[in-house]
């Protein structure tokens, strides 16, 4: 029990007690402004295009916001004024600034709460002497790991991490490393008013997209803290249920430290939960051959154990979310499949284990005999059906895969339209370069090529045949030669390599740090 207590309390000494005064420092919002404009400025998140960021990010506006935000129904009164006086300049200005205030304070808060993480990240990298290699951030780096480890595993569990979580639980998660009560109180109040704003905004305008996009960084941070708390308990169960020291999770956690997403967690009540709901089944989790990988809200858990063992882990996750996070989670959302018979969808690929049998004839003097060998190969394929569904959601084609025009892009120039479609194709080719069979990707390129032609024809009120005849070679160059150009730069010229057979070669790029937008829609 002492070891358990120390495991949960080992990070409590790093709590930050004085963060609330930083809300009144002007350089915090200048930093948020710079990170919003700089594509490589953020340590923890991808670049974010923020609505309304300009020179108005000043300390005076922040003080005015914090004064007015504590007034009752500040956000809702601003929305009411805007809806009742949509064409009156003064009220429209108040509506704009209320959105701008909420956006600015959320970005500033996100910058402030990143400070303890940055300090922890720097100290951890120095302590563990981890090299600052950008290859550790690559999403594609997980596939060589799976290719090396999954060949002898039996089962895989597809896990969908539930969301949204209650706002109060999100605040409680932060209490373990932030002792600043005013800051937590302000966050709780801001989330409450933000929730009221969204409820009213959805009712009146049937849309929440713009406002939710403005505060994307803050809620992504809160989501990461929630996900890590789930994994914190999972790693504890995995670590203390086996007598063997495992290394896979250590590598995984080190990569999370490099990402800068290792968060301290609330430790109170966790011990009670573990004793009540997990203590009786710890003996059955003695499986040293287990690996876990997650990206965003989807995770996989692979094991060399039995189906019964995987079911125990399944209900372990269900109990965690139901009893600790008070989230009703249906067990059918966790699928358990046998690797030798089923494929699993992860990170935009359909992965499976292929078994190939070969027969070797052995001749020894007058005796000859046949030897049958069975080899297992980790295979990754392009999920064509899922990509077509994603393209249909983005309005590039129908659900059946029939290309359609993109009316929203008809205001662009011809070169701009071609460049946008070509960039989508290049990104897809780059991301799915690890597929062993790329014929399905050619179909996706064909859909985008014809959708581009239909968009140009719609813009000029002409036929598709006319634009295919006029720009056929150019479209062919944009949509079909990009993969060959990449291969010609990567592979040595001394090695003969016919591009006609390049669809079977798998290449993993170590510069991909985010999922393709079309893949992310799945």
Swiss-Prot record:
Is Calcium tagged as a keyword?
no
One example of the protein's molecular function in GO is: RNA binding
Taxonomy, superkingdom: Eukaryota
| Keyword RNA-binding tagged | yes
- Keywords, in A-Z order: Chloroplast, mRNA processing, Plastid, RNA-binding, tRNA processing
**This protein is called what?**
Maturase K
Q: What does this protein do?
A: Usually encoded in the trnK tRNA gene intron. Probably assists in splicing its own and other chloroplast group II introns.
Q: Which organism is it from?
A: Pillansia templemannii
Q: Which InterPro entries match?
A: Domain_X, Maturase_MatK, Maturase_MatK_N
Instruction: Report the sequence similarity comment from the record.
Output: Belongs to the intron maturase 2 family. MatK subfamily.
Q: Name one GO cellular component term.
A: chloroplast
């Amino acid at each position: 029990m002492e070891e358990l207590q120390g495991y949960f309390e080992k990070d409590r000494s790093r709590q930050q007690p004085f963060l609330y005064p930083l809300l009144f420092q002007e350089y915090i919002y200048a930093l948020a402004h710079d990170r919003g404009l700089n594509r490589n400025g953020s340590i923890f998140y991808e670049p974010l295009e923020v609505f309304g960021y300009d020179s108005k990010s000043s300390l005076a506006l922040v003080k005015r916001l914090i004064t007015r935000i504590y007034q009752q129904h500040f956000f809702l009164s601003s929305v009411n004024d805007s809806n009742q006086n949509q064409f009156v300049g003064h009220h429209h200005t108040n509506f704009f600034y209320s959105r701008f205030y909420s956006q600015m304070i959320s970005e500033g808060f996100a910058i402030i709460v990143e400070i303890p993480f940055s300090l922890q990240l720097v100290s951890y990298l120095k302590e563990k002497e981890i090299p600052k290699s950008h290859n550790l951030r690559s999403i594609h780096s997980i596939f060589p790991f799976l290719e090396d480890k999954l060949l002898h595993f039996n089962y895989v569990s597809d896990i969908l991490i539930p969301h949204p979580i209650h706002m109060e639980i999100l605040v409680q998660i932060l209490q373990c490393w932030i002792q600043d009560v005013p800051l937590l109180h302000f966050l709780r109040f801001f989330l409450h008013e933000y929730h009221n704003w969204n409820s009213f905004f959805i009712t009146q305008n049937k849309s929440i997209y713009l406002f939710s996009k403005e505060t994307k960084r803050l809620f992504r941070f809160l989501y990461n803290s929630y996900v890590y708390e789930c994994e914190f308990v999972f790693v504890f169960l995995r670590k203390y249920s086996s007598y063997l020291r495992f290394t896979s999770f250590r590598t995984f956690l080190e990569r999370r430290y490099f990402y800068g997403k290792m968060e301290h967690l609330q430790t109170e009540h966790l011990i009670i939960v573990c004793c009540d709901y997990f203590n009786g089944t710890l003996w059955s989790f003695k499986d040293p051959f287990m690996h876990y990988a997650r990206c965003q809200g989807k995770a996989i858990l692979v094991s060399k154990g039995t189906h019964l063992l995987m079911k125990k882990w399944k209900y372990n996750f269900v109990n965690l979310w139901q009893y600790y996070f008070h989230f009703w989670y249906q067990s059918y959302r966790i699928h358990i499949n046998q690797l030798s018979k089923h494929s699993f969808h992860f990170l935009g690929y359909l992965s499976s284990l292929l078994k190939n049998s070969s027969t070797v004839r052995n001749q020894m003097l007058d005796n000859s005999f046949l030897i049958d060998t069975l080899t297992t190969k980790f295979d990754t394929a392009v999920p064509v059906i899922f990509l077509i569904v994603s393209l249909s959601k983005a309005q590039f084609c129908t659900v059946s895969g029939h290309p359609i025009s993109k009316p929203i892009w008809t205001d662009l120039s011809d070169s701009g339209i071609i460049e946008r479609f070509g960039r989508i194709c290049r990104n897809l080719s780059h991301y799915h370069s690890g597929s062993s069979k790329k014929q399905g990707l050619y179909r996706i390129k064909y859909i985008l090529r014809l959708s581009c032609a239909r968009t140009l024809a719609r813009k000029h009120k002409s036929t598709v045949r006319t634009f295919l005849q006029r720009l056929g070679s150019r479209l062919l160059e944009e949509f079909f030669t990009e993969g060959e150009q990449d291969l010609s730069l990567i592979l040595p010229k001394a090695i003969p390599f016919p591009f006609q057979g390049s669809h079977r070669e798998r290449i993993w790029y170590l510069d991909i740090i985010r999922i393709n937008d079309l893949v992310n829609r799945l």
